[in-house]
Structures are given as structure tokens and as C-alpha cells.
Amino acid sequence: MVELEIVWLVRGAWITVWIVSILPLVIASIPTSKLNSFRELVLSFAGRGKILHPSSQKFTIPQKCFAHFYVIGVVWTTLLLAATWMYACKMAPLSSEEFQLSDIASRLAGGSDVFSVHKSNMTPVEHRFKVWRAVFLLLLMEIHVLRRLIESFYVFKYSPSARMHILGYFAGLFFYVTAPLSLCSNIAPEVAGFVGNQVAEFIANGKSHTSAPEFNLLSSISPLMKLGSLQWIGGAIFLWGWIHQRRCHAILGSLRENPSQAKEYIIPYGDWFGMVSSPHFLAEIVLYAGLLIASGGTDITIWLLFGFVAANLTYAAGETHRWYLRKFENYPANRHAIFPYVY
């Protein structure tokens, strides 16, 4: 029952965010002049940096506060990853004899239990596979947020005038707390129970009477090598998006290396910028698509997470593209907003 409560709490949070934030973006994207006032209102809340409406400077904070998202993301994801990994090693070990990869992976990604949150019909081996899959997803998320944190300090040089609405700031904090939890929400209660028991044992027995946990590097990593094809395909797609986002962020950061350019905007070139105006947004969608595939694609919570990322960044990319077209007369005509040859 606790598992159901956690899962539906996370799903409820995503559904609420969809109604409050994504639905207005969809309505604002309808191409009709009757919605101009509504569109400006939405952009005043959702815009940031160069696409923030000039009249919306009230209730804004510097865009460099983006770093707060990644500090929260790194700390929270690290805690979830460490707890889940310890739980997996101690309570869900995998042996090569019992771990029949193709059968387990195909069943967990199959149709009969799609979107299910119940584990009563799972065998112990299938449940252990599910736990190690969560470890894999959190490990990918850790790689992502750690790079974003490093970039926020050493790559991006925000214009002093770049700001974002305070509601957008809170939305970012919400995202980097809820996104990692979404990747492991179906096992979070048992992991929390395991951690609670370990803490209680430590408090009750004291440090001198608590046995040091055994650590075997091979046994801690080898189960990840036994995951299914969906996990490795998803991981490869994730890394593809991750690498291109790193390159695109490096290009954007290089545009402001000269202090005299701190307040200037320059047309970026290189990597996926040859095709779209916001390739870093496209790469973000690609890497979250990788997480979705690696999850098996059967958890509606992760679908809600992916949909939020895709909808939010598609809208932001469209506004960014229109800004570029207004700002630069020589802007490349062959570039699309975010999806090559489509939009």
C-alpha cells in the first residue's frame, strides 16, 4: 500500500504540473491573434533570458540561479542512488544462474503489466531485476545532473541582465526533486525502509557494535552488466544526447568568453546548431527519451516526466527561434526551432 501511495503521489504531482504549466503552453501555442494577450501572460511566467518579456522583470531573479537546480539535483540524486545501490547489493543480489536476461526483460517490458504498480505477480528474480534497473536509471541521471552542475559554474557565463521568473525558479526546483524520484518511485518505499532499518540499527547498537558493511566492487557492478537490451539501447541514446548537449553548451559558453561580449548575443554555429536553433534542448529531449527506453517504457510516471520535458522545451525552443529571427536579419534560413526538418 505504501508503494502505491508513493507512486500515485509522484504521478499526481506530475499531472498537476501538466495542468498548471503545460496546458497553458499548449493553448498559448495555438496560432490565433485572439490569444495574443494570453500568450504574453504565459511568456511572462515561462520565459527566461532573452525570451523573457521586457515588461515581466517584476518577480524575477538572476538566471545564474540555475545552478541551484543542479546543486539540488546532484545532492538528491546521489542520495537516491547510494541508498538504492546499497539496497540492491544487500537485498537484491543477482546470480548468473538465476538471472535469465531475455525472459525477465521481455516480461517486464511486455504488455500484461504495462503501467502496473503492483509487484505481487512478480517473481523474486524479476523484482531484483527491477531494483537494478532503477540503479541504472539513477546512475544515468547522476551523470546528467553532475555535468549540468559543472557547466553552471565553469561553462555558462550569463548576461548580467538575464533573468527568469520566480515561478520558473520554483518549477525548476520541483523538477530536479521529482525527476530522480520518478525513476525509482516504484521501489522507493522498500529502499526507504531498508535505510531506516540501517539507521535504527546503528543508533541502537552504536558504532562499535555495528558490523561494517562488506563491499565487493565486482558484485556491486556486475549486475548492471546483466541488464537487458532495452537498458543498453536506452543508455546509448542517453549518452548520444548527453554528448551533443555537452558540445552545444560548450559552443554557447564560448560565445561569452570575452568580457566585452557579456551583453551581446551572437548566432551560434557548430554541432547540431547547423540544423536547429536550440540543439541543447533537442539533446535534453533525446537523453530523457533514452531514460524512458531504458526504463522499459511501461511506467506511466516516467512517461509523464518525459512528456513534461518534451513539451516544455519545445515551447521554449519555438520562442527562442522566433527571437533569433527577429534579432538577426542574416539568421540561417535552413534552421528549424528544435526538431530537424519538422519544427
Swiss-Prot record:
What InterPro entries does this protein map onto? 3-oxo-5_a-steroid_4-DH_C, Dfg10/SRD5A3
Q: Where in the cell is it found?
A: Endoplasmic reticulum membrane
Chief location category: endoplasmic reticulum
Per UniProt, the keywords (alphabetical) are:
Endoplasmic reticulum, Membrane, NADP, Oxidoreductase, Transmembrane, Transmembrane helix
Q: What does the record say about its membrane topology?
A: Multi-pass membrane protein
Q: Tell me which Pfam families the record gives.
A: Steroid_dh
What's an example Gene Ontology biological process for this entry? dolichol biosynthetic process
Q: Which domain of life is it from?
A: Eukaryota
Q: Which GO terms describe its molecular function?
A: polyprenal reductase activity
Kindly list the residue ranges recorded as spanning the membrane: 12-32, 66-86, 164-184, 223-243, 266-286, 291-311
Task: Tell me the route in metabolism or biology where this protein functions.
Answer: Protein modification; protein glycosylation
Cite the EC number: 1.3.1.94
Tissue specificity is: Expressed in roots, leaves, stems and flowers.
Give the catalytic activity.
a di-trans,poly-cis-dolichal + NADP(+) = a di-trans,poly-cis-polyprenal + NADPH + H(+)
Q: Which Gene Ontology cellular-component terms appear in the entry?
A: endoplasmic reticulum; endoplasmic reticulum membrane; Golgi apparatus
How does inactivating the gene affect the organism?
Male sterility, when homozygous. Deformed and non-viable pollen grains.
Please give the function described in this protein's UniProt entry.
Plays a key role in early steps of protein N-linked glycosylation by being involved in the conversion of polyprenol into dolichol. Acts as a polyprenal reductase that mediates the reduction of polyprenal into dolichal in a NADP-dependent mechanism. Dolichols are required for the synthesis of dolichol-linked monosaccharides and the oligosaccharide precursor used for N-glycosylation. Involved in the regulation of plant growth and reproductive processes.
Similarity section: Belongs to the steroid 5-alpha reductase family. Polyprenal reductase subfamily.
Query: Which protein are we looking at?
Result: Polyprenal reductase 2
The primary gene name is: PPRD2
